[in-house]
Amino acid sequence: MTLLRDLLLLYINSLLFINPSIGENILVFLPTKTYSHFKPLEPLFQELAMRGHNVTVFSGFSLTKNISNYSSIVFSAEIEFVNIGMGNLRKQSRIYNWIYVHNELQNYFTQLISDNQLQELLSNKDTQFDLIFIELYHVDGVFALSHRFNCPIIGLSFQPVLPIYNWLIGNPTTFSYIPHVYLPFTDIMSFWKRIINAVFSIFTAAFYNFVSTKGYQKHVDLLLRQTESPKLNIEELSESLSLILAEFHFSSAYTRPNLPNVIDIAGIHIQSPKPLPQDLLDFLDQSEHGVIYVSLGTLIDPIHTDHLGLNLINVFRKLRQRVIWKWKKEFFHDVPKNVLIGEWFPQIDILNHPRCKLFISHGGYHSMLESIYSSVPILGIPFFTDQHHNTAIIEKLKIGKKASTEASEEDLLTAVKELLSNETFKRNSQHQSSIFRDRPMSPMDTAIYWTEYILRYKGASHMKSAVIDLYWFQYILLDIILFYSLIVLILLCILRIFFRMLTK
């Protein structure tokens, strides 16, 4: 009888500690069809599903795990600049790149809106969501989804937050020491660099307000055409942005102020290293002088980098180290014996192998974070967008070096040999790795907590700054400055009149 009573009490107590939350309906909207944007945060969506939430992912890729309450809607539209390759972009100015990428994404999203599956999702009145994740990357028309489903939005930034989204949510952005992510600067800028940073940042803001919003408004109208809602403008809809989950960490960039609704989750895509396939493990274990891992990202078309590729191959011929290179085999016919080429390798698992001595990368933000996490020095060869900014940070932290895509074979060989022989780079990498890993909560737990926080408090409007309700001239106190200037001017005029009267 006592045993039965104890079991009953244990059962009642266990019920008290069961999480009473009911699974919410979450829509993940990832319109840009780039795998490097989909793969890093998929573990977050999987974890939300495993916690009981119903997660629907609208993207260009199929899900990698089969979970009962985790479903996908896969679209087939392609971004034009991905189809033609990114090689030509590196030859253009940064303003040209900004405008080009913006225009291509605008045209692409106009086509994406007509996707039959998306239209079916929007027209089904029985479909409801409690929260929407959206990718913050030049496709702000998707803010209209918050009105259609009457729910808050969490923005996903796959790099340090772009200034336009900092301004949308009220996060302070000071040009004097916060560089634009598309510029090759760090937080320590000379006078001329600060001028360039301010001009470029103001240009992108003006472009957003006077050009981009017109395209976004068109997308809003198209998305809401099947609803009976009155015409809404993009400025009103952007207020539904409740939180930003950003892949940014002060140790891997620079220190900057953030509002409480801008959350750092840098490294969320990094999972514990897994055992390597036997052939790769043997290749690494048997490398007497270590291994160099090479990956130039997923968007770099080899046809636009043949000069760089040939120079790298010739450099590798002269090294004692073995090389694992993620590339297309058909572009090289005479591959050295110390080089293993394949179209895919488990990057984080290779970087964490003790024999991995150097990472040659395009300077992508995720690659930089994985290099820091794994304590591996990096040679960055940037092509476009934020990659120049990332490699500038690499040099600032002294965990690697930067090389041009047009670098000669001799220059590349010199840089590689210095990174392999100078132990300072390795020590700095280990130090940065220690700082990067030292956090009170893992990036995954942080993202889950704040996602469910927004769900609990229905958008958590109490976290929003009053700055989002100010005009730009109020934010920079221009009206106050003009007011006091006017008072001073009036006083000077009065004094002038008074002295004239005295001198008569």
From Swiss-Prot:
Segments passing through the bilayer: 475-495
GO molecular function: UDP-glycosyltransferase activity
Spans within the Cytoplasmic topological domain: 496-504
Glycosylation sites: N54, N66, N69, N422
Compartment(s): Microsome membrane
Broad class of enzyme this protein falls into: transferase
Enzyme Commission number(s): 2.4.1.-
Stored CDD domains: GT1_Gtf-like
GO cellular component terms given for this protein: endoplasmic reticulum; membrane
Keyword Transmembrane on entry: yes
PROSITE patterns assigned: UDPGT
Bilayer topology: Single-pass type I membrane protein
Function: Catalyzes the transfer of a glycosyl group from a UDP-sugar to an acceptor molecule.
Classification via PANTHER family: EG:EG0003.4 PROTEIN-RELATED, FI06409P-RELATED
Family that this chain belongs to: Belongs to the UDP-glycosyltransferase family.
Record-given protein name: UDP-glycosyltransferase UGT4
Organism: Dactylopius coccus
Gene: UGT4
